[in-house]
């Protein structure tokens, strides 16, 4: 049996997880996408098929603070705090965390911890 690449393993985990993670109006889904250089997070209402709010390391608000945010845990925690602030402003307090097939470690964990500290419950 051949070994799958890390990207294919992540995609396979994501498909398996998405069967059970469904966000609605009361508890939307906090979806995380991690690339080599950036991290993106969205709060999604799957029943209405709308994105309630989003944040990433390429946001204007974050780029104004510094020219280039490094792809590390510090920038991920900044994104998590910003996303939580935007979600609470829209009236969302509880979410379902969708790690996107990524292992709950490093940048994904930093984003989740920062969102929890800023007031989101999951």
UniProtKB/Swiss-Prot annotation:
The keyword Nuclease does not apply. Pfam families: Ribosomal_L18p. Keywords: Ribonucleoprotein, Ribosomal protein, RNA-binding, rRNA-binding. GO terms for biological process: translation. GO terms for molecular function: 5S rRNA binding; structural constituent of ribosome. InterPro entries: Ribosomal_uL18_bac-type (IPR004389), Ribosomal_uL18_bac/euk (IPR005484). The keyword RNA-binding applies. CDD domains: Ribosomal_L18_L5e (cd00432). GO terms for cellular component: cytosolic large ribosomal subunit. Part of the 50S ribosomal subunit; part of the 5S rRNA/L5/L18/L25 subcomplex. Contacts the 5S and 23S rRNAs. NCBIfam families: L18_bact. PANTHER family: 39S RIBOSOMAL PROTEIN L18, MITOCHONDRIAL (PTHR12899), LARGE RIBOSOMAL SUBUNIT PROTEIN UL18M (PTHR12899:SF3). This is one of the proteins that bind and probably mediate the attachment of the 5S RNA into the large ribosomal subunit, where it forms part of the central protuberance. Belongs to the universal ribosomal protein uL18 family. This is Large ribosomal subunit protein uL18. The lineage of its organism: Bacteria, Bacillati, Cyanobacteriota, Cyanophyceae, Synechococcales. The gene is rplR.
């Amino acid at each position: 049996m051949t070994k799958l690449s890390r990207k294919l393993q992540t995609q396979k985990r994501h498909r398996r997880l998405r069967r059970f993670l469904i966000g609605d109006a009361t508890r939307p889904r906090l979806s995380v996408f991690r690339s080599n250089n950036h991290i993106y997070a969205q709060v999604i209402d799957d029943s209405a098929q709308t994105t309630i709010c989003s944040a990433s390391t390429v946001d204007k608000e974050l780029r104004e603070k510094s020219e280039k945010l490094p792809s590390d845990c510090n920038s991920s925690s900044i994104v998590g705090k910003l996303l939580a602030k935007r979600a609470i402003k829209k009236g969302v307090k509880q979410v379902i965390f969708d790690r996107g097939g990524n292992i709950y470690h490093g940048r994904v964990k930093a984003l989740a911890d920062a969102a929890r500290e800023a007031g989101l419950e999951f």
